[in-house]
C-alpha cells in the first residue's frame, strides 16, 4: 500500500503517467493502444469459459468472467472500437480479437470492474503529460473513443482509449439512471463561473448536463493548460467560483492544475474539485495533501451537486 502511494505520488507530482500498451491485431505494424496503469488490476489468461448474456454474444460484451470469485463483464476491445451507438444491434463477430490464448486486462475505474480482451501486451511506457496530445476527432474517434495519443517509439504512436466512453457504451442503462438522478437535483443560485477541465468527450457531456441542470454558468476546456491560461488571463479568476478538473489530461494533469491554483496567492482560496475515474486511496490521499476541496468518482451526480452547493453557497 505504501509503495503504491509513493509510486502514485512520484508520477503525479512530476506531471507524469505510465501506460500499458497492447495490440488487437497480429500484423507487425498493427496499431498500438494504451491505458493508464492505475486503472489496471491485473493481467490474466482465462480458460475460455464465459457466462453468456441474454441476447447472445455478437455485441461488444462477450459475457461474464469469474475472477477470484467476482463476476466481471468481458469486453472485446476490437469489437468496441467498431461499435456504433446508432446501430447497437449490429453483429460484431467479424471484428473480434482473433486469439486462442484468451489474454485479458482486468481493470477497475469509476467504481466499475471490467475485463478487456486483447491480443498481445507490448510494454509499459513512461511519459510526461507534455508528451501527450489530444486524439484526432476523426476515424474511429468520431465518437470519442480515443482520449489522447503519444509516441511509443520513433516510428509508432499509441492511441490512449477513453475508458469512460467504453463504460457508457457497454452499460447504456447507466445513462438512463443518470437522467433519473438529474431530475432529483435542484438548481443552485449563483452567478459565479465554473471552469471544467476534461478531455473525455463522454465525461464532459455528463458534467455539462449536471451544471446545466443546476442552471450554472460554465466554461469547459480539453486540458488543464487551457484552463489555467484562461484563469489567469485578464484576472478571470475573480469571476470563478469553482474549478472541476479531471486527472488524466494531455499537456498537464489535474494534479498540476490543483498545485498551480493552490500555490498562487491570487487563487489559493479557489475551490478545486477532482473528478476522476481513478478512485484509488492513493489518488484521494494525494489530492487531499495538495488541498483539493473535493474528490468525486467520475461523475457522481449527487456528489458533484452537493460539493457545488457547498462551495458556491
From Swiss-Prot:
Phosphorylated; probably by transfer of CheAY phosphate group. Disruption phenotype: Deletion mutant is fully chemotactic and forms swarms the same way as wild-type strain. Mutant shows however defects in mouse colonization. The modification 4-aspartylphosphate is found at residue 246. InterPro entries: Chemotax_regulator_CheV, CheW-like_dom_sf, CheW-lke_dom, CheY-like_superfamily, Sig_transdc_resp-reg_receiver. It comes from the Bacteria. GO terms for biological process: chemotaxis; phosphorelay signal transduction system. It holds the Pfam family Response_reg. Residues 16-172 form the CheW-like domain. Keywords: Phosphoprotein. Residues 193-313 form the Response regulatory domain. PANTHER family: CHEMOTAXIS PROTEIN CHEV. Plays a role in chemotaxis signal transduction system in order to colonize the host stomach. May act as a phosphate sink to control the flow of phosphate to CheAY. This is Chemotaxis protein CheV2. It comes from Helicobacter pylori (strain ATCC 700392 / 26695) (Campylobacter pylori). The lineage of its organism: Bacteria, Pseudomonadati, Campylobacterota, Epsilonproteobacteria, Campylobacterales.
Amino acid at each position: 500500500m505504501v509503495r503504491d502511494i509513493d509510486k502514485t505520488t512520484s508520477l503525479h507530482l512530476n506531471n507524469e503517467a505510465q501506460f500499458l500498451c497492447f495490440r488487437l491485431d497480429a500484423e507487425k505494424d498493427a496499431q498500438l493502444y494504451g491505458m493508464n496503469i492505475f486503472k489496471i488490476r491485473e493481467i490474466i489468461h482465462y480458460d475460455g469459459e464465459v457466462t453468456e448474456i441474454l441476447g447472445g454474444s455478437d455485441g461488444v460484451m462477450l459475457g461474464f468472467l469469474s475472477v477470484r470469485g467476482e463476476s466481471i463483464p468481458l469486453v472485446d476491445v476490437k469489437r468496441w472500437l467498431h461499435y456504433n451507438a446508432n446501430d447497437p444491434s449490429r453483429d460484431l463477430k467479424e471484428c473480434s480479437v482473433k486469439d486462442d490464448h484468451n489474454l485479458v486486462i482486468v481493470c477497475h475505474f469509476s467504481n466499475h470492474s471490467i475485463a478487456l480482451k486483447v491480443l498481445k501486451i507490448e510494454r509499459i511506457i513512461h511519459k510526461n503529460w507534455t508528451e501527450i496530445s489530444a486524439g484526432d476527432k476523426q476515424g474511429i474517434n468520431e465518437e470519442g473513443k480515443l482520449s489522447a495519443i503519444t509516441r511509443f517509439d520513433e516510428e509508432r504512436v499509441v492511441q490512449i482509449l477513453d475508458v469512460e466512453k467504453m463504460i457508457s457504451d457497454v452499460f447504456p442503462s447507466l445513462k438512463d439512471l443518470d437522467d433519473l438522478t438529474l431530475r432529483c437535483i435542484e438548481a443552485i443560485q449563483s452567478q459565479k463561473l465554473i471552469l471544467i477541465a476534461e478531455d473525455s468527450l463522454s465525461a464532459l457531456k455528463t458534467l455539462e448536463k449536471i451544471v446545466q441542470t443546476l442552471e450554472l454558468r460554465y466554461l469547459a476546456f480539453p486540458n488543464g493548460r487551457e484552463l489555467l491560461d484562461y484563469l489567469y488571463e485578464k484576472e478571470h479568476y475573480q469571476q470563478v467560483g469553482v474549478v472541476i478538473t479531471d486527472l488524466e489530461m494531455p499537456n498537464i494533469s489535474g494534479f498540476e492544475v490543483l498545485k498551480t491554483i493552490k500555490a498562487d496567492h491570487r487563487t489559493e482560496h479557489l475551490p478545486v474539485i477532482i473528478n476522476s475515474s481513478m478512485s484509488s486511496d492513493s489518488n484521494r490521499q494525494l489530492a487531499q495533501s495538495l488541498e483539493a476541496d473535493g474528490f468525486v468518482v467520475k461523475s457522481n451526480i449527487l456528489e458533484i451537486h452537493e460539493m457545488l452547493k457547498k462551495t458556491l453557497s
